[in-house]
Each structure stands twice: as structure tokens, then as C-alpha cells.
Amino acid sequence: MLQNNIELDLKTKLIEAGLTQKEIAEQIGVSLAYVNRITKGREQIVNKTFMKIMDELGYDVRLTFEKREDQSAV
């Protein structure tokens, strides 16, 4: 199973933007507690929320799918 590091990426992007969890929560209309749970990995981030956060931070998000050459890994 693949694991993602969305929580770590989110923390990094907030630091790079100089924003606090409280500030981003206010900007996207969610609670500080919710953002905190996401960044600590205690709650799965919803795609809609992730997209709002990345939009506020000035990022375009692209999702790509690439077919594996080795089908035995599926």
C-alpha cells in the first residue's frame, strides 16, 4: 500500500508561506482544531479541503496517473 505525506507537505507549505494553522483555517473557513488534526495525521484530509488550502497558498495541484511497466506489482 502506498502512503502519502500530504500532512508533512501541508506543514512544509504553511511554514514556507509564513502562515499559522489558525490563519489558514480562517482563510478557508474551517476550524483550527480540524487543521491541527490534519497536520498531525489524526484525521484524513478531504480532497476539497486540501484543494482549498493549496489554492490559498498559491499552488496548482496536478494529479497524474502513470501505468506501471511491471504489472506484477499490482
Model-derived features: positions:
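Helix-turn-helix DNA-binding elements, focusing on the entry/boundary residues of the two helices
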Residues: Q21, L32, N47-F50
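DNA major-groove recognition helix of helix-turn-helix/homeodomain DNA-binding modules
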Residues: K48-L63
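Recognition helix of helix-turn-helix/homeodomain-like DNA-binding domains
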Residues: G29-Q44
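Short, charged recognition helix plus adjacent turn
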Residues: T64-V74
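A short, Lys/Arg-rich alpha-helix, primarily the initiator
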Residues: M1-A17
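Short alpha-helical "recognition helix" segments of helix-turn-helix
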Residues: I24-A25
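Glycine-centered signal
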Residues: G18-L19, N36
